[in-house]
Amino acid sequence: MTSNLNLLPKGFVKLDDDGTIIETGALEQESDCTEFYEGVIIPGFVNSHCHIELSHLEGVFSQESGMAGFIKQIRVQRESAPKERRVEAIKAQMDKMHKDGVSAIADISNCDESFCVKSSSPVYTRSFLEVFGSESGDATNIMKGLEELLSTALSCGIDASPSPHSCYTMSRELLRRSSIAALDSGYISYHNQESWEEEELIRRGKGPLADDYKSRGMSTPEINPEGPMSYFIDVIRGKGENRIPGEKIEGNALFVHNTFTDKNSIELATKTFSNPFWALCPLSNIFIHKALPPVEMLRREKAAITLGTDSLSSNRVLSMIEEMKIIQRYFPSVPLNEIIGWATING
């Protein structure tokens, strides 16, 4: 989506008295009112994946724990601070992102703690109300709670919609029902192929996640040797009279992380979804897995890439600039104008 974007030397932005942008272009001649800024003037950043609710966990988690270790830390630490402090941390990080040039955030919400901050923030947020649960018998009650959370979000004036978490934390029943509800809204956000443990669990029914779930008496997903993306699509497509009709599934599909995705998964998603996007959170991937997504492969497959920060439980800072820097550091062949596009217009 960003291959035709180019940086404009001596570019200018002309503002009205109230700050409204009224003209942009290449500066031919300076005037007395021209203000020069060293650097690049760009549109507002779009943080396409964030868990702002976890802002109170800054500096708490151990790095390189793997997904199973990360989940254990979440279970122990998520509510380790009082609610008042959690809300204060949310506001502080929302304010910081706005100051750093973020104009919109695709944020994951598991509860309503961020709603009051979002409703008064100058930053636009699209809240994906995320659910998870490994037992099929719990799906109805979880979906009922999701409907109540959605009602609360809408009453606060927040744009929100249902969202599944991922194949490795959900029963087939809950994954399908929450995904259908998300697609009905026109938007779905989904954690995809974030860890090698996820791959092991879905492809072989083995690995640290499988061991952890079994030790806690939890159900594990059915094995799909073709991998998590195939599993996800099989579940939401459905079968027989419940099968989603049409050649492609309509709506905007945001696949998040993709650290261990492959060519077959990318092709399958492109073939199945009408408008797929691929959100990368490289600093989070390094923090948890000491790994990075296959950026060059995604580019070769002409994937629509976006950038996100994830949360302060898996990142040292919520900074779009730092995410862009890490892309430049490890993938120096990617042009700056393309990375800017990922961080802005694609999001």
Task: Indicate where each model-derived feature is located.
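N-terminal metal-binding scaffold of metallo-dependent hydrolase/deaminase domains
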Residues: 1-30
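Hydrophobic faces of well-ordered beta-strands that scaffold small-molecule active sites
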Residues: 44-48, 105-106, 125-129, 160-164, ...
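Active-site gating loops and adjacent loop-to-helix segments of metal-dependent hydrolytic enzymes
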Residues: 56-88, 126-129, 196-250, 272, ...
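Active-site loop-helix segments enriched in His/Asp/Glu that coordinate
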Residues: 81-161, 165-183
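C-terminal helical cap
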Residues: 88-97, 277, 281-288, 330-347
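Glycine-enriched alpha-helix->loop->beta-strand junction motifs that scaffold or abut catalytic
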Residues: 121-125, 181-187, 248-251, 268-279, ...
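His/Asp/Glu-enriched, well-ordered alpha-helical/loop segment
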Residues: 291-347
